[in-house]
């Protein structure tokens, strides 16, 4: 059983201009206290054929991780268009929200993102060079792809078992080519996080979220 469960993800400011920051309101529950922080990442897939074009837009550490229910807003800059091939800017790509504990990724939420011009004439007659300030992104929030990976949340309890736990396989295929995302070396520590009791989660607090998304595992 996982020690951390995502209970809700709300995509804010969507649709939005391509250059606007991403904003995700994330609610999750912690079933057992953890010694280390959780690491949340937002990854933009720049090319379906070449993962070297993936961009880690944000990586933050969230803690302490005590038993309870939590909610925070993850904000990330838009991807750098100069690091995306011109032919890959317009069209459909993937955005990945991941969470890891002690360098072990245990959940990944994938969204399709459609980038297109907000002007009908530009859509019908696209310019040779992409006009990035005219591009609008639309995150398709109705059917996020959720993948869970079994990990050891309490390795300190198995220090006497010799070599430790065997490598684990994911419950479902990755959203993108079955590959793990690129990790940042020095993630930032996120300070603003809200904890609320069970009555909030079961009652009004969750109801206040705009356009809550039901996360269905695949």
From Swiss-Prot:
Gene encoding the protein: ASF1B
Task performed by this protein: Histone chaperone that facilitates histone deposition and histone exchange and removal during nucleosome assembly and disassembly.
Family: Belongs to the ASF1 family.
Subcellular location: Nucleus
Record's GO cellular component terms: cytoplasm; nucleus
The keyword Nucleus appears for this protein: yes
GO biological process: cell division; chromatin organization; DNA-mediated transformation; double-strand break repair via homologous recombination; mitotic cell size control checkpoint signaling; regulation of cell size; trichome branching
Protein name as catalogued: Histone chaperone ASF1B
Assigned keywords, A-Z: Chaperone, Chromatin regulator, Nucleus, Phosphoprotein, Transcription, Transcription regulation
Organism from which the protein derives: Arabidopsis thaliana
Subunit and partners: Interacts with histone H3 and histone H4. Interacts strongly with the N-terminus of TOUSLED.
Gene3D superfamilies, A to Z: Histone chaperone ASF1-like
PTM section of the record: Phosphorylated in vitro by TOUSLED.
Major subcellular location class: nucleus
InterPro entries: ASF1-like, ASF1-like_sf
Entry keyword Transcription: yes
The organism's place on the tree of life at top rank: Eukaryota
């Amino acid at each position: 059983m996982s020690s951390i469960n995502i209970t809700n993800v709300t995509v804010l400011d969507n649709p939005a201009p391509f250059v606007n920051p991403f904003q995700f309101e994330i609610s999750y529950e912690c079933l057992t206290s953890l010694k280390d922080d959780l690491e949340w990442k937002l990854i933009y897939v720049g090319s379906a054929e070449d993962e070297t074009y993936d961009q880690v837009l944000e990586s933050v550490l969230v803690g302490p991780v005590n038993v309870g229910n939590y909610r925070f807003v993850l904000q990330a800059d838009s991807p750098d268009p100069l690091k995306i091939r011109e032919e890959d800017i317009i069209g459909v790509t993937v955005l990945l929200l991941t969470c890891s504990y002690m360098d072990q990724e245990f959940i990944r939420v994938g969204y399709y993102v459609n980038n297109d011009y907000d002007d009908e004439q530009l859509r019908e007659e696209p310019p040779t060079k992409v006009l990035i300030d005219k591009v609008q992104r639309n995150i398709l929030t109705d059917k996020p792809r959720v993948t869970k990976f079994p990990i050891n949340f309490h390795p300190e309890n198995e220090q006497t078992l010799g070599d430790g736990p065997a490598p684990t396989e994911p419950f479902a295929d990755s959203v993108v080519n079955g590959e793990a995302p690129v990790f940042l070396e020095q993630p930032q520590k996120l300070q603003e996080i809200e904890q609320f009791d069970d009555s909030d989660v079961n009652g009004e607090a969750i109801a206040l979220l705009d356009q809550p998304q039901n996360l269905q595992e695949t």
